[in-house]
UniProtKB/Swiss-Prot annotation:
Superkingdom to which the source organism belongs: Bacteria
Sequence similarity: Belongs to the reaction center PufL/M/PsbA/D family.
Lineage: Bacteria, Pseudomonadati, Pseudomonadota, Alphaproteobacteria, Hyphomicrobiales
Underlying gene: pufL
CDD domains: Photo-RC_L
Name of the protein this chain belongs to: Reaction center protein L chain
NCBIfam families, per database record: pufL
Binding site for Fe cation: 191, 231
Cited InterPro entries: Photo_II_D1/D2_sf (IPR036854), Photo_RC_L (IPR005871), Photo_RC_L/M (IPR000484), Photo_RC_L/M_CS (IPR055265)
Organism name: Blastochloris viridis (Rhodopseudomonas viridis)
Amino acid sequence: MALLSFERKYRVRGGTLIGGDLFDFWVGPYFVGFFGVSAIFFIFLGVSLIGYAASQGPTWDPFAISINPPDLKYGLGAAPLLEGGFWQAITVCALGAFISWMLREVEISRKLGIGWHVPLAFCVPIFMFCVLQVFRPLLLGSWGHAFPYGILSHLDWVNNFGYQYLNWHYNPGHMSSVSFLFVNAMALGLHGGLILSVANPGDGDKVKTAEHENQYFRDVVGYSIGALSIHRLGLFLASNIFLTGAFGTIASGPFWTRGWPEWWGWWLDIPFWS
């Protein structure tokens, strides 16, 4: 694949965290690096384990295939392969692939001399995965509290997990997570729509400037956050979708065992309206 005119300028040595020049190369448009190699290794091994574990199951229906975590009786120990051991190995591969990909992003950022905002943002969903598959099961004392790898089985797990606490919508972490999701979608949707509107004027009109963008939002909501800050806001909102969701998830079980509607009892005791 031919390089674009400006790409060679940025394909410089250095910036690697491990391996030095040994892994400091590109394959086509893709930077490899040590963590690119480790990511490929974990992805290949994990997918192979999923395929082999599926071959030991009762069906090849892609919707019904399920790699289940160990039974609660195994606690935090290693389980036999067909009784949750595959799930444990696949989870290790998933974490290895996710973390490798994040560190590869760090190396690319170091090469370009830019901030680490992208890898730090990617850390947030990795943290959410760790909460579900590692931290919460550790606090509860068994890997069996994690979710299975499968389409329908995962949906069943989400459904059953929510009903264990009567109504998951009353979970304050879930409430906050969904609120951040909706606000983020609205904010970045408005931003994207505005950029398209100023960059695609009607026939005979000139492309508009940042001043037009700022004035539009001043007219609509009385304030414009600015072209740079809207991306900071988007990062903040998107990160908090996972962070507040992780709080609500890890609190369920280790720190709160009753239905989430009961948690709101304090609201009824506030002197103003009690």
